[in-house]
């Protein structure tokens, strides 16, 4: 039992680290207090959180030295921090199935630390019959605040043969990120992409160079199937022929997901997605930047990316604007099993008129597996005389 004398005020002493593969100056800059400041246990918890959030360590033990503090005339408490490195390689998987796309898989390989500066590497691959994608990213944290300030360099390749779209895309990006406050993070990126595509009957090649500004935040409580959480992301990008792009285009996007649980068994998931492209050269906009609605995480009941304007031949062209929303209610049936009902609505078009909105509704089952939520959904269009089929969706992966 540790008992503090309320008449004596303890302060923080020096912080030391043992067992770390990361250089100590980087770790010292993560310490949320200074030597000589009044001791608060919340600061010890915050140091633990920051070290955990770095992703470098498998175990963390932060211990104030009470005995040394009592013996010290200055009443300083040295803080001993013992850590053990995270394994050098980890693999994550995701699996899914839907009526329109068929089976799909995702594989992520991570190297959480490459050197004593805390650099990290991540490769992600997605594969289905209609789309194949490979992304690679390299993260360089800055010594002055490795958790909140870093550079990210990335590149990727995507092949798509879906509906009336055939495209090959090559992308590169350099991004500088900063943490702001209460979990908000801002980023400034310079992006390059080269696309060779056929959309409907139109063949094209487009190169784009553009800066992009982003603001995002993700919060969650409750493990892999959060009981409480939200995710927000807002981006604005601008391509211009003045700096080498083939087209001029202003691109705006906003995404929001909200999760709330009441009385431990009533869970609500709300989603919205808004996108806008302003350009005089829409035929030159790559399909990967155009908007198509429909499918899982969009409007369930419709084929994947099947909602879009059409040309005179009836081929999908993609849209310059999109808005979708979803509300889902889940009820805990027993243990880790949940039932679900949902309603999705939205459209992808050349304007934001709220007529002729596409709607889908359905029911589903959720299971809290050790790997994350596994879901099975059955959905169909609502009030659409041209579409009345039933779609099935099976998925494994995070909701935020």
Question: Across the structure, where does each feature detected by a protein language model lie?
Answer:
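C-terminal structured "cap/appendage" subdomains that terminate the fold
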Residues: 346-378, 382-392
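Second-shell loop/turn segments in exported
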Residues: 13, 17, 30-38, 122-123
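Transmembrane beta-barrel strand/turn architecture of Gram-negative outer membrane proteins
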Residues: 174, 232-240, 247-278
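Extracytoplasmic gating/loop element in the C-terminal half of outer-membrane beta-barrel translocons
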Residues: 77, 264-342, 350
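Outer-membrane beta-barrel and related beta-rich outer-membrane complex signature
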Residues: 198-202, 246, 280-290, 353, ...
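Gram-negative/organellar outer-membrane beta-barrel architecture
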Residues: 20, 40-233, 250, 260, ...
């Amino acid at each position: 039992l540790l008992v503090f004398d309320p008449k004596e005020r303890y302060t923080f002493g020096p912080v030391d680290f043992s067992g770390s593969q990361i250089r100590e100056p980087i770790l010292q800059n993560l310490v949320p207090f200074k030597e000589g400041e009044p001791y608060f246990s919340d600061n010890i918890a915050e140091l633990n959180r920051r070290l955990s959030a770095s992703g470098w360590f498998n175990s963390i033990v932060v211990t104030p030295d009470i005995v040394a503090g009592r013996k010290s005339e200055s009443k300083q408490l040295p803080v001993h921090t013992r850590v053990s490195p995270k394994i050098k390689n980890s693999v994550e998987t995701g699996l899914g199935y839907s009526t329109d796309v068929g089976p799909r898989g995702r594989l992520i390989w991570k190297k959480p630390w490459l050197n004593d500066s805390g650099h990290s590497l991540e490769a992600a691959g997605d594969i289905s019959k209609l789309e194949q994608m490979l992304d690679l990213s390299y993260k360089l944290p800055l010594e002055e605040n490795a958790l909140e300030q870093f550079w990210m360099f990335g590149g990727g390749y995507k092949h798509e043969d879906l509906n009336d779209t055939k495209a090959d895309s090559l992308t590169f990006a350099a991004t500088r990120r900063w943490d702001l406050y209460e979990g908000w993070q801002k980023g400034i990126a310079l992006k390059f992409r080269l696309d060779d595509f056929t959309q409907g009957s139109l063949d094209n090649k487009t190169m784009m160079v553009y800066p992009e500004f982003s603001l995002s935040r993700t919060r969650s409580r409750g493990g892999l199937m959060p009981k409480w959480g939200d995710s927000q992301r807002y981006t604005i990008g601008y391509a211009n022929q003045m700096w080498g792009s083939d087209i001029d285009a202003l691109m705006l996007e906003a995404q929001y997901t909200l999760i709330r649980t009441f009385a431990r068994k009533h869970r609500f998931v709300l989603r919205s997605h808004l996108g806008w492209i302003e350009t005089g050269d829409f035929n030159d906009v790559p399909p990967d930047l155009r908007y198509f609605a429909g499918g899982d995480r969009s409007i369930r009941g419709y084929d994947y990316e099947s909602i879009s304007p059409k040309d005179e031949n009836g081929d999908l062209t993609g849209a310059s604007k999109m808005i979708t929303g979803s509300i889902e209610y889940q009820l805990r049936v027993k243990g880790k099993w949940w039932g679900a009902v949902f309603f999705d609505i939205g459209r992808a078009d050349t304007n934001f008129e709220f007529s002729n909105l596409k709607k889908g509704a359905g029911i589903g089952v959720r299971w809290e597996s050790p790997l994350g939520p596994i879901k099975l959904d059955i959905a169909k269009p609502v009030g659409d005389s041209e579409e009345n089929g039933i779609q099935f969706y099976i998925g494994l992966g995070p909701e935020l």
